[in-house]
Structure formats: C-alpha cells, structure tokens
Curated annotation (Swiss-Prot):
The gene is Uba1. This is Ubiquitin-like modifier-activating enzyme 1. The modification Phosphothreonine is found at T800. Catalyzes the first step in ubiquitin conjugation to mark cellular proteins for degradation through the ubiquitin-proteasome system. Activates ubiquitin by first adenylating its C-terminal glycine residue with ATP, and thereafter linking this residue to the side chain of a cysteine residue in E1, yielding a ubiquitin-E1 thioester and free AMP. Essential for the formation of radiation-induced foci, timely DNA repair and for response to replication stress. Promotes the recruitment of TP53BP1 and BRCA1 at DNA damage sites. Its EC number is 6.2.1.45. Pathway: Protein modification; protein ubiquitination. Residues 21-38 have a biased composition (Polar residues). GO terms for biological process: DNA damage response. Sequence repeats lie at residues 63-199, 459-611. It comes from Mus musculus (Mouse).
C-alpha cells in the first residue's frame, strides 16, 4: 500500500460554524478550489493546519474543530512512572500543542515494571529527562520538554491542562485549588497495584459541544399535526432513534414551511416513529415530505474543585457488580496517602502489620468524614487488599487508567465528549490467585530486577511462570503494538523456554503512526511485525519475540500446524476483520487454547476472553449483519450521501477494475467465455458487453481519447440516464393508489449540464480520464488547463429518451427480470469479440482502490462522482474527508481507546496464565470513553448439549484413530460401524469442510463404491485436493440418529490419520 509523503499537509475547515451546529463548513459544503496539490485536483482551504494523512483515523473520532482545539492546548504531565508515560504517550500521539514532562525522581528498578521508555542503564537518572527524547519521537508536531523543578504557580500558569500522577494528596489539593481558581483544567490519576483512581476538574463553566460523539441522526417525515404540541410522524422504514431532550431542525417540508430552517427545537419522544415538537397550531397545513435532523446543541457543565469534591464526591461506575466499592476506595485512597506521608513509602507487599495500620487509618478517615462520604460499615477486607498490593506497579492497570486519563485530557482541551464527573475508581482484584493462601510476604519481596512492581502483587513464582509462556499474537497494528508493549513489560515469554510469535503481513503507512506507537516516520513502508518486534526488544531486551509475515488461514496451516499450536499456551487476536477472528477462534477451539479477543471502534472498545471447557467461543454469538442498501436505491432512487458514495465505489470497480480483469482473463484463458456463460442471470451479458466495450467500442489510442471517454461518461451518468428516468417517471407521476411517485424516500432528480468552468465537473473528467488511461497503460496528465482546452473540442452525441426502456422500481422486480436472458444477444457478442491471437502482447491494468494515497486520483474520482450524483438528487454533498470514511469503509480509531482496551486484555491474561477455573473470575468488558460508560460481565458458559446421557459442549469431540493396529486405514464402512457399536449412533450424513462424504440418500452405486474405500481417499477424491503432509487429522461433521431413530446433535470428529 502506498502512502503520502510525511511532510505533506492539507489545509482544512473554515470559519466557525453557526452556534448550535455540529458540522463544520468542511463537512457540510462542497470542497472548492483554493490550492491545487500535486495531482491537480481541487482541495478545501483553511486557516489551521491539520496533517490529515497522519491524523486521518483520529479525525473521524474527534472531528476537525476538536482537533484544532487540541492543537492550541499545552499540557503538563507530572510524574513519569508507568502511568505518567502512558498518559504522555497518548496525548502526544493525539496531537496537542505541546507537552511538558515533570518529575523530580530518579529511575528505580520497580519503575521498569511498567515505564516502557526507561531502561536498566537509566537507573539513577531523572525519569522525565530520560523519557523526553523517546516520547518526542512519537509526533514531530508536538514539542516535548522535560522539567525537574518544583510545581510553582508561575510555572503551572502556562498550561491549559495539568495532569498529576502518583502525587501526594497534599500536593494534589494545593495544585487543584490553584488550577480551579485560574481556570486551568486538572486531571489527577493514580494507580496502586490492582487499583486505579481518576479525578477531573474542568472548571466552573465548561462548554460541552458534543456529549456522545455519535453522528447526528436524521429521518424522513411522513406527517406533522397542527396541534399544541405538534406531533411528527416519521416514515416507518426505520426507527427515528431520537431521545427526549434532543434538539432537531427541519428541511424540505412541503406545506408547513414554518418548520424549514427554524431554530433547533427540543423534542419529546412518543414512540419509535413519533415525537412532539413546539406549538404548530398556527402553522400552515402539512402536505408532504421533509427531513428532520438532530442538532448537537452546546451545553455548559460545572465542576467542583478537588478540595470541595473530596468531601462531596460524585462517582462514575466502572463495574456495576461492585456498586459500593467507589465510596469505600475513596476512603481507602485517602488513608493510603496518610500512610505514605507517615512512612515515606506505601505498605509493604502482603505485610500484615502495615495492612492492619492502613485499616486503622481508613477507619479514622471514615470517622471524621462528612455524611456525604462516611460509610456505615468500612470494607476492611478491601482496605487490607489495597495495602497488600499498593506497592505494586502493573503495566495493564497503567494502560487502562492511562488511556482513560489521556481521553479526559482531550475532552478538557476540546469540549468533545462527556467528561468523567468527577471521580472514577477501578480495581481488578479478580486477577489475584483463586487460592487465597498462595501469596506470602516472602514471595512478594523486591528482587532488585525489572519485574519488582509486578512481583509485589503476584509473587515471584508467577513471574517465573509468565516468563515461560508461549503466545501467538495475530496482528501488529494498533492493538498488536499495545499488546506487545504490555507483554514486554509484564515479562510474557521473556525467559528460557518462553516465546511470543507475532504475525502481520502489512507494511507501515503514515496514517498508522497516530496510534500504532511502536512505529516512527522512518519506518513507513517497512513490515509491521519486524518493526514492532525490534521496538519491544528495546523496551525489554529479554523478550523472546519472533516475527512472521503470514496471513492466518487455511493457506498457512502448514506453518501454523499441529506442532505449532500444541506448543502454545494461548493466542491473542489483534485483528481488524471478522473472518480472520472467526478462523482463529475455530483454531483455538480445535486445539483447546485460550483466546484473548478485543476490538475498538472510535471511543468504543470490547474485550472477550475464551477459556477451553469453561466459556463460549468468540463465534458462539454474532452481531446482526449490517443492513445493505437495496440495488434499486443505489441505481435509481438514492436519498442519502451514503447511497451516492456506494454508487461511486461501484462505478470505480465497474469502470477501472472488473473490465480490465475480465479482458485479461479473456485474452489468456481459452475457457473464460464458456465459464462466463454459466454465470447466473444477466451476468454473462454484463461481463461480455464490458469486454466488448474495453476491446472494441471504447478502446483509447491517445490521452485525448481518454478525455473524450470521460466527458461522454459524465453525460451518460449525470444527464442522459437522469433524463431517461424522468421520461419513465415524470415529476408529476402518480402511483396506482394516486399518491405522488416521487415522495418519501424517492427524491425526484434533475439532469446536470456540463460546464468546463465548474470545478467539480472538471474534477470528475480529470480523475476519470487519468484512471481510464491507467487501465490501458497510457500516460495521463495533471494539467487542468490543457484538459479544459481538450474538452472544448469534444463532440457529445445528442440524446433522446427512449420509450420501452424498463427501469426497475424494486429489487424484487429486478430479480425477476434477471431470470430472462437474451440468447441471441449473447451469440452476437461472442461473434463480435476480437480473437485473442489478434491482440498479441495486449493487456490491461486493473486498478485496486487505495483510499490513502492523495496523488492517485482514486478518492478524487469517488468524491466527484458521488457529489455530482448528490447534486442530481438534491442531496447535501460530502467533503473528501467524510467521503473517504464512508467509501473507504474506514474504522475510526484513537490511541486512548486502544491503550485502555489492551490494559483490560492483559488483566485477563494474568488470570489465564494463573489458570483461574471459576467463570466469575473472568471479565468480558465493553467501554465507551465518550459517554463515559464501562460494562463488565462474566463470560457466558459454553452451551451444553446432550445425546443419550452424554453431555457435551463445543470443546468436546469424538477422537477416532484412523490408522488401525495393522497399519491400515479405516474404511467408510468401518467408520460407520464404529459409531454404531461404540456410541449407538447411526450416521445419516458425513462431511469434511464443504465435501459430502456420505449420506443416507446417496445413489446405491456410489455408496457401494465408497464403503470399502479408506476415509482419506474419499476426502481427496470428493474435494479434488491431495492432503498435505502437515495434515495429521481431519475434522468430520456428523448428522446422526439415536437408537429410536430420532435426530440427535453430536460433537464433531477428530479423525487422526498420522
């Protein structure tokens, strides 16, 4: 995949949007010429520079306005241990104006447990000074400086946001009071072993521009009553999705025109398709039509200062199963600060004397607390556990709390998303051994090595076990990079016999650098897996990491074979598609290995843990399929920009990829035509017509021919086809029931007139002509003036709409029409195609769509094609940025979510390595940092099935030895008899993959032939594939009857052949 040069920037956005509007002009208005970049295409202009090629995926989360506000905010991060460096990393990647690192302490052994930018040779050096150059590499747009002096008021005054980590309560209160009085936003973050704490104070009056980050909803109106209040009814194609308290605006309403362009109005939801608005009793009568759109209205929120909030706290829940815990930990953390002040150190790990003292201090804090904080009964067991682990420093806890804290910093800078109001407490006590007696003070003593912060919590035996683990990490993108960092910090596979194997076939692109933090600008075009492996060796030189570049799937099962999987202790997925996830899930179920699964989408993230014989698998539950756009909507009746963008993507494939591929196959494969004629419906006609067009009717000889073709195609799509559609269905057409045909979701189009001086029209011709030329190996041009001159001489044929042209109104109509094919037309086409031997050496060059290269004309074509069609149908156009999101199917992403999610994954990893056996020890997690929302649940148990008295789950199977003691392989008859005698099951159908090996309705002759054949021979014959030497066993699926003839569900068969 190609990528843009690192220095290239786009100027984006424009003047401030209207108050109450959620979209910038760049989102709502068509891109126009202000500067012409290297490929001659027009772009938007603006005052603020945002490097879109770097921040692309994050911009889809935050938006341009929030991003500009980030770029004007200077942030102080105080405390550069594991938590501080995590927060600093995330906000530097995020692109704030500048970051100052503050720490007066020096590197200790325990810091290396989670501070990934400190090394053994740094012990004794200042943490901020050592970390500064390594953090500065993350983003060349963000100056990073180190400061080792005291936090005096003059110094603090120069920042918009101050972050305190691992700081004493006394310092927090002093800084908090000062920041609140000066309008400086404050985030306080702390981690203590398996516990985390977060506090936010963003001032007396903060303007929140968007509380949830979701795209504003819109719906089509079918009725508005004249009433007080008026009731709006939406078309029943889909629920409106609004909530009471939302604000909406109206457009395109016919009749009740007072609604169009009115100020945003608050609504009350009455049902899934109805809601009430203002008093409409004096408005005109509603006739038809209209679009109602949600409007994000800014609102003001207020925060208490840290001293005030300490005695009157508000909590955000992280786990509803621990409802009373935040209030208890609010007391516990205050007591812990007192203990540290008294002893100049936290309680010693697992030390009973220190734990008892902390409980006493907590009781005293509770006793003098005001009623709003005071607990009726202090959870002494919880406080004792806090004492046991408070000296610990765990990378996964720091990743989770650090991801959250960094997102809060971004909220403070931008006013985007709802902040944490105001305290958050988190714990992961389920990570402790299920055997309560397993840990002793002796086992948790510091060893003066890099894992001391972790040994303090889990003991030295567990550290040894971690070092010997063998793990397979699939993917080295954003989640993969974070997982590798955490693996290195916790010591996974870092000892003798341990190993982490990471595979990823992708190379690094510039847009990756914003969140895949192991990569640097100079790594662009290098392999991800190799680069990531080299980077984590810098973090922990002891990690045994091996990098591969293989795609996981049936094609690589000779590499990731039985031996490979049987040697593993577990698998972690870091994938970006469902198919690969489900494949790895099947492999883990087959080899009975734990699987750690996770994913992110913008500020949303999820974690799932799959444990053999205990939980369901990843594939046990699936999301409902995405709703596809009906073909007729795309072809004739679009009503949303998503429709025109999908149409443009289909155009790209149908013009610049599929015809070239078909031509090349026609020229090189003698059976191509024969194969094509066997395709269903009208496909043979469409394919052969495209080949004829490419080789005969439209084959260009010069660049001028390509410009002519592009101009003609423009007229076909944006003028002639629309005129034909309006000929079939005039604007005043009525349906059989007397209703207007062009109403509801059907928008009446109008044809466009080509104008060489219209930037968008020229954009289209430039992009289409260059891409068309590329498919023929001709040289294109980026000279807009020269192309405009060529267009003056292009003769456009006259078009007259024809009668008798069938235009399908529904997909059902289209499908029934597709059933009939004109055979005489097919014969005519075959006769007119030139013989391949008359075109020696000729080939075409199919183009694969690549969204991230701004110089290749791909997105230029998509934007122009989509926006011209949008103009046909009076649909609001989309700028390049939004078009790329939708047409490129980009997954919005931000470093903060990835860090937090991977922190949760690695907490589950602690449990997996220890071998936790209780289902309620594990936690599947879901979070949305924008809301903020956190939800945890124990994984679902594997569903249980039964035949006879035998219970089984997806983890069970029949083990059948194919090779008999005499060295001969089992025949099909022996296999069927084996199940009858051993399991009292009569097999009615038997399959391997998609190959049917046996069925009760099989023809007698075929059955007789197969019964005496060895099983592997039947598999090879039916599948027409030879079994590879790496295949030691086959997976066979059965349909069975029990002795009473009833159909019973049974496990699969693992049939061993070597």
């Amino acid at each position: 995949m190609s990528s843009s040069p690192l220095s290239k920037k786009r100027r984006v956005s424009g003047p401030d949007p209207k108050p109450g509007s959620n979209c910038s002009p760049a989102q709502s208005a068509l891109s126009e010429v202000s500067s012409v970049p290297t490929n001659g295409m027009a772009k938007n202009g603006s005052e603020a520079d945002i490097d879109e090629s770097l921040y692309s995926r994050q911009l889809y989360v935050l938006g341009h306005e929030a991003m500009k506000m980030l770029q004007t905010s200077s942030v102080l991060v105080s405390g550069l241990r594991g938590l501080g460096v995590e927060i600093a990393k995330n906000i530097i990647l995020g692109g704030v104006k500048a970051v100052t690192l503050h720490d007066q302490g020096t590197t200790q052994w325990a810091d290396l447990s989670s501070q990934f930018y400190l090394r053994e040779e740094d012990i004794g050096k200042n943490r901020a000074e050592v970390s500064q150059p390594r953090l500065a590499e993350l983003n060349s747009y963000v100056p990073v400086t180190a400061y080792t002096g005291p936090l005096v008021e003059d110094f603090l005054s120069s920042f918009q946001v101050v972050v305190l980590t691992n700081s004493p309560l006394e310092a927090q209160l002093r800084v908090g009071e000062f920041c609140h009085s000066r309008g400086i936003k404050l985030v306080v973050a702390d981690t203590r072993g398996l516990f985390g704490q977060l506090f936010c104070d963003f001032g007396e009056e903060m303007v929140l521009t968007d509380s949830n980050g979701e795209q504003p909803l819109s719906a089509m109106v079918s009725m508005v009553t004249k009433d007080n209040p008026g009731v709006v009814t939406c078309l029943d194609e889909a629920r409106h999705g609004f909530e009471t308290g939302d604000f909406v605006s109206f457009s395109e309403v016919q009749g009740m025109i007072q609604l169009n362009g009115c100020q945003p109005m608050e609504i009350k939801v009455l049902g899934p398709y109805t809601f009430s608005i203002c008093d409409t009793s004096n408005f005109s009568d509603y006739i038809r039509g209209g679009i109602v759109s949600q409007v994000k209205v800014p609102k003001k929120i207020s925060f208490k200062s840290l001293p005030a909030s300490l005695v009157e706290p508000d909590f955000v829940m992280t786990d509803f199963a621990k409802y009373s815990r935040p209030a208890q930990l609010h007391i516990g953390f205050q007591a812990l600060h007192q203990f540290c002040a008294l002893h100049n150190q936290p309680p010693r790990p697992r030390n009973e004397e220190d734990a008892t003292e902390l409980v006493g201090l907590a009781q005293a804090v509770n006793a003098r607390s005001p009623p709003s904080v005071k607990q009726n009964s202090l959870d002494e067991d919880l406080i004792r556990k806090l004492a046991y682990v408070a000296a610990g420093d765990l990378a996964p806890i720091n990743a989770f709390i650090g991801g959250l804290a960094a997102q809060e910093v971004m909220k403070a800078c931008s006013g985007k998303f709802m902040p944490i109001m105001q305290w958050l407490y988190f714990d992961a006590l389920e990570c402790l051994p299920e055997d309560k007696e397993a840990l002793t003070e002796e086992k948790c003593l510091p060893r003066q090595n890099r894992y001391d912060g972790q040994v303090a919590v889990f003991g030295s035996d567990f550290q040894e076990k971690l070092s010997k683990q063998k793990y397979f990490l699939v993917g080295a993108g954003a989640i993969g990079c974070e997982l590798l960092k955490n693996f290195a910090m916790i010591g996974l596979g870092c000892g003798e016999g341990g190993e982490v194997v990471v595979t990823d076939m992708d190379t690094i692109e510039k847009s990756n650098l914003n969140r895949q933090f192991l990569f640097r600008p100079w790594d662009v075009t290098k392999l991800k897996s190799d680069t990531a492996a080299a980077a984590v060796r810098q973090m922990n030189p002891y990690i045994q990491v091996t990098s591969h570049q293989n795609r996981v799937g049936p094609d690589t099962e000779r590499i990731y074979d039985d031996d490979f999987f049987q040697n593993l202790d577990g698998v972690a997925n870091a994938l970006d598609n469902i198919d690969a996830r489900m494949y790895m899930d099947r492999r883990c179920v087959y080899y009975r290995k734990p699987l750690l699964e996770s994913g992110t989408l913008g500020t949303k993230g999820n974690v799932q843990v799959v444990i053999p014989f205990l939980t369901e698998s990843y594939s046990s539950s699936q999301d409902p399929p995405e709703k596809s756009i009906p073909i007729c909507t795309l072809k004739n009746f679009p009503n949303a920009i998503e429709h025109t963008l999908q149409w443009a993507r289909d155009e790209f494939e149908g013009l610049f990829k599929q015809p070239a591929e078909n031509v090349n196959q026609y020229l090189t494969d003698s059976k191509f035509v024969e194969r094509t004629l066997r395709l269903a419906g009208t496909q043979p006609l469409e394919v052969l017509e495209a080949v004829q067009r490419s080789l005969v009717l439209q084959r260009p000889q010069t660049w001028g021919d390509c410009v002519t073709w592009a101009c003609h195609h423009w007229h076909t799509q944006y003028c002639n086809n629309i005129r034909q559609l309006l000929h079939n269905f005039p604007p005043d057409q009525l349906t059989s029931s007397g209703a207007p045909f062009w109403s509801g979701p059907k928008r009446c189009p109008h044809p466009l007139t080509f104008d060489v001086n219209n930037t968008l029209h020229l954009d289209y011709v430039m992009a289409a002509a260059n891409l068309f030329a590329q498919t023929y190996g001709l040289t294109g041009s980026q000279d807009r003036a020269a192309v405009a001159s060529l267009l003056q001489s292009v003769q456009v044929p006259e078009f007259t709409p024809k009668s008798g042209v069938k235009i399908h109104v529904s997909d059902q109509e289209l499908q029934s029409a597709n059933a009939s094919v004109d055979d005489s037309r097919l014969e005519e086409l075959k006769a007119t195609l030139p013989s391949p031997d008359k075109l020696p050496g000729f080939k075409m060059y199919p183009i694969d769509f690549e969204k991230d290269d701004d110089s290749n004309f791909h997105m230029d074509f998509i934007v122009a094609a989509s926006n011209l069609r949008a103009e046909n149908y009076d649909i609001s156009p989309a700028d390049r940025h939004k078009s790329k999101l939708i047409a490129g199917k980009i997954i919005p992403a931000i470093a903060t979510t990835t860090a937090a999610v991977v922190g949760l994954v690695c907490l589950e990893l602690y449990k997996v390595v220890q071998g936790h056996q209780q289902l309620d020890s594990y936690k599947n997690g879901f979070l949305n940092l924008a809301l903020p929302f956190f939800g945890f649940s124990e994984p679902l148990a594997a569903p249980r099935h039964q035949y006879y008295n035998q219970e089984w789950t997806l983890w069970d199977r029949f083990e059948v030895q194919g090779l008999q003691p005499n060295g001969e392989e089992m025949t099909l008859k022996q296999f069927l008899d084996y199940f009858k005698t051993e399991h009292k099951l009569e097999i009615t159908m038997l399959s391997q993959g998609v190959s049917m090996l046996y069925s009760f309705f099989m023809p007698a002759a075929k059955l007789k032939e197969r019964l005496d054949q060895p099983m592997t021979e039947i598999v090879s014959r039916v599948s027409k594939r030879k079994l590879g030497r790496h295949v030691r066993a086959l997976v066979l699926e059965l349909c069975c009857n029990d002795e009473s003839g009833e159909d019973v569900e049974v496990p699969y068969v693992r049939y061993t052949i070597r």
